[in-house]
Amino acid sequence: MTATIIDGKAVAEAIRNEVKAEVTQLRAKGLTPGLATVIVGARPDSVSYVTSKRKTCEELGIRSIGVEFPEDVSQDELLARVRQLSSDPQVHGILVQLPLPRHINEEVILNAVDIDKDVDGFHPVNVGKLGMKGREPLFAPCTPLGVIELLDRMGAKISGSRAVVLGRSNIVGLPVALLLLGRDATVTICHSKTQALAEVCRQADILVAAIGRPRFVTANMVKPGAYVIDVGVNSLPVLNPDGSPVISEKTGKPKTKLVGDVDFDAVKEIAAAITPVPGGVGPMTIAMLMKNTLRGAKHAFGLL
């Protein structure tokens, strides 16, 4: 058996097109969704992420409200701006790019985001609702939502399945486990203290890896015919046959490559379907952010 490779780029593009079509319909009625992105400082990775999000907004017809602060902004000033955005009727989603500088309490800032504009899904109220039966939050975190979306679009049967989640982070592991549980999967969360890990993983019809350990999941940990979703993103050096690092002619530095938490080449011979790294879960995050922003706007417009 050779697994179907789940093309996250293609699925993300389909979602963006769906969002764009709905946004176009809303704008024709004079209703424009708006997403505010708040960034503090100029970390290259944060700037890159925020720029990508703002560009996607423009492509889909979503109003992009960019808010930039210097690294030394006071917590009070940042807090005041977030509260202002929370009360702005033209803003339907607020994203505060993390990490924030050390002198700012991230929890205080994130808690100031209106729960009906918490498109990242990290407000304690939304997280709490995610864990309560019958209390579906308006938003769930984007990457876990992307995992579920990929499974759905691949035709995976979630209800009644055995799902194993490797990792218990607040960003991916816990929320994806709760989303799977909410879809009536029988869920096991594994972590560094889990005993007989390979045996537990082999029971999974759906295996989600989100631990940040390169190629940790090997073929002997995967049940034949399982759906394997690799959320991990790890950087490894590119090596010559003799084991020495390959040096880039352009930069003079060792070349690196991205790999996931799953040994892709081995596991693809066992699984029914698998996400690659890169090109699997990664592209889904911004697509689901746009979908959450649209959802927030529809909620504000009384259309949900």
Question: Predicted segment positions?
Answer:
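Positively charged, low-complexity intrinsically disordered leader regions
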Residues: 1-31
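Anion-binding alpha/beta catalytic cores of soluble intermediary-metabolism enzymes, centered on
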Residues: 93-159, 200
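Glycine-rich phosphate/diphosphate-binding loop of Rossmann-like nucleotide-binding domains
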Residues: 40-55, 134-231, 236-245, 254-268
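Short beta-strand segments enriched in small/hydrophobic residues
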Residues: 32-41
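Short beta-strand segments
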Residues: 39, 95-99, 166
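Short, well-structured alpha-helical segments in soluble
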Residues: 77-89
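Rossmann-fold NAD(P)-binding glycine/threonine-rich loop
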Residues: 107-114, 118, 127, 232-301
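Short beta-strand elements in bilobed, periplasmic/extracellular small-molecule ligand-binding domains
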Residues: 35, 57-72, 187-189
